């Protein structure tokens, strides 16, 4: 494969071509990635592509393949997950369906070979060796610290949940049929080699997962081999399939995914209810009743459609004149379900406040800023119609890594604080300042100032400097 940068071809007459090929210099240090900040982590992950170039030319547009002749990076990638890691994980308690799937592609369809209950390494290895089955491990960041470290930083960078799956495929086999996903995908090749084929999307920026029949997808527009240390990105909706060629060692890769249900459409759905709620307080037309029997109509009437169109224009005008865009669910959902900050120790700094107790003469600063959201919502403790607005602060410091991206809604709870709307300006001061004197906070009394910072300090959200 060429070692110089080469743009992706169209894939029309000349056949499948690579997306983008780059050679990078070996990164220094034991991790081979830069964890100084979320942006530095992402920049090192896609190196040597520049972040600006990535978002201008590739993000949500087309695939990017970065092929690297870098032994240090290949070794680091290999440390993220190995086939042999399954043995120790099974001894900790892994269950079919929840934690691991065993499958293979047969005649263009996914055949699931799961057993019932607990997964045992010897059985997994038997299916892997004898049935040529792919082993898929769900959300390995729950168990592998370095993946936790990577994905936590990526969640800070994207402001969106970041999940992962490990796929281990034996030689001469394919685990999944051609399909497309509803997520932005970054693939890191960890062990062995894998043969990839990418096709034009039938549904660009798809909102759901779908299997596609071979006869529908045509010829691949990109075809290549991934080797340890290589990285592949493709947008949601990109049809793809991958196999481990016969005669080679098994392949292991991790798929890191993000931006599920994180579109402008999702954000509009999330914010429109808040806009209507506020507008209805001031506009009597929005409080007027709909025509009798409108809900019994098979189709909306012309009058109703015209009325709704007018309301939407009014809301659009109102939106342009305000800075208050209320996210009712997306902010809270993200913070509630994301990873807690990476901690190499016991995580005491996330649950026990440290340092000096903040006083009126203290200077304080926010910590774990990427793990906190501040939002204004109607008081959730009031059930009457005249709900007063409150300031809510949600954080992920106490989130459970063990259930990250596992859909355990009954085990998920929100962590945070609630303040009167009169505290909003003071909270914005803390958010927007590198450090600020407690005495300078925009609150009426000294007692309010001390009470505010003490509440934040108790939740480990600020520190005295």
UniProtKB/Swiss-Prot annotation:
Any single GO BP term: ribosome biogenesis
Annotated positions binding Fe cation: 179, 181, 240
Modified residues (Phosphoserine): 309
EC number(s) reported in the record: 1.14.11.79
Subcellular location: Nucleus; Nucleus, Nucleolus
Any GO molecular function: peptidyl-histidine dioxygenase activity
Cited InterPro entries: JmjC_dom, NO66-like, ROXA-like_wH
Top enzyme category: oxidoreductase
UniProt KW Magnesium keyword: no
Family indicated by similarity: Belongs to the ROX family. MINA53 subfamily.
Task of the protein: Oxygenase that can act as both a histone lysine demethylase and a ribosomal histidine hydroxylase. Is involved in the demethylation of trimethylated 'Lys-9' on histone H3 (H3K9me3), leading to an increase in ribosomal RNA expression. Also catalyzes the hydroxylation of 60S ribosomal protein L27a on 'His-39'. May play an important role in cell growth and survival. May be involved in ribosome biogenesis, most likely during the assembly process of pre-ribosomal particles.
Protein name (record): Ribosomal oxygenase 2
Record organism: Pongo abelii (Sumatran orangutan)
Name of the gene: RIOX2
